[in-house]
Regions:
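Conserved ABC transporter NBD signature motif
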Residues: 56-64, 73
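Helix-to-loop junction immediately C-terminal to a conserved catalytic motif
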Residues: 48
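The feature captures the beta-strand-to-loop junction immediately N-terminal to the Walker
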Residues: 33-35
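Conserved ABC ATPase "signature" region
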Residues: 97, 110-128, 153, 158
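Conserved small/polar residues in nucleotide/adenosyl-binding loops
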Residues: 256-259
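Conserved ABC ATPase signature
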Residues: 132-136, 140
Length: 259
């Protein structure tokens, strides 16, 4: 379990997160939602130890994050950020191999190669394995980075807008894949995401931010409601049933407030 206790963070003199406390459920897909600049990515960077909070603390599996050994932490959590730098003349397979570094320290063994192959297959990029990253489309590169994160094979996977640059087919494929990692392998996945309908269909739990404050949290069905979404996004969103799920219709809306 991930426990967040009274986290506040500021850049220069401006607070971007204020007194955030919550517990993120294990073995679930947790979606961080909210408008641009609400604090979602900052929170993800803090719980992955990429950013030190101004105040407060984070614990993973009962141990304070700052007390984790770096190598042990890299075997426990994976973070795929929003800004990805493409190394010159690196192939897809070479990139995915980096996901095994916390385990192999550069000396790949049979288990490492099996995980690499599995990640390439799950993301459907086996045929791109020998292609150089700078030869790929943005969507293909994104799939390669997701494969690298999967190859790391950690208990916790943190993804910051992983659907960037993906077409509808690949975006849906990735969300189904992440869902299967939770269901079949007991992974805990925290994902920053803007597409509220993917949240509705695939997330188990939602944490919503507005102006740096945690404004709503709970099971997905408790968040996908007109009144709650209005408070989060400042716009009226129609909600329609689709089987046992809900679809949010927000293409023609009226605004109540902008955050």
């Amino acid at each position: 379990m991930i426990e967040i206790r009274d986290i506040s963070t500021k850049y220069r003199e401006t607070f971007v997160l204020r007194h955030v406390s919550t517990r993120l459920p294990s073995d679930r897909m947790v979606a961080f939602i909210g408008s641009n600049g609400a604090g979602k990515s900052t929170m993800l960077n803090i719980i992955s130890r990429l950013l030190e909070p101004t105040e407060g603390s984070v614990s993973i599996d009962g141990r304070e994050l700052r007390k984790w050994d770096s190598r042990e932490l890299a075997k426990t959590l994976t973070i795929l950020g929003q800004t990805l730098h493409t190394p010159a003349r690196l192939t897809v397979e070479e990139l995915v191999r980096f996901g095994r570094f916390p385990h192999s320290r550069g000396r790949l063994e049979n288990q490492d190669f099996l995980q690499i192959e599995k990640a390439l297959e799950l993301t459907e990029i086996v045929d791109l394995r020998h292609c150089y990253l700078d030869e790929l489309s943005g969507g293909q590169r994104q799939m390669a980075y997701i494969a690298m994160a999967i190859a790391q094979d950690t208990k916790y996977i943190f993804l910051d807008e992983p659907l960037n640059n993906l077409d509808m087919h690949r975006a849906a494929r990735i969300m189904k894949l992440l869902r299967s990692l939770v269901r079949e392998q007991g992974k805990t996945i925290c994902i920053v995401i803007h597409d509220i309908n993917f949240v509705s269909f695939y997330a188990d739990y939602v944490v919503a931010f507005r102006d740096g404050v945690l404004c709503h949290q709970g099971p997905t069905e408790d968040i996908i409601r007109t009144d709650v979404l209005r408070d989060i996004y400042g716009m009226d969103i129609a909600i329609e049933p689709y089987g046992d799920k809900k679809i949010c219709v927000y293409y023609a809306v009226s605004y109540t407030h902008l955050t």
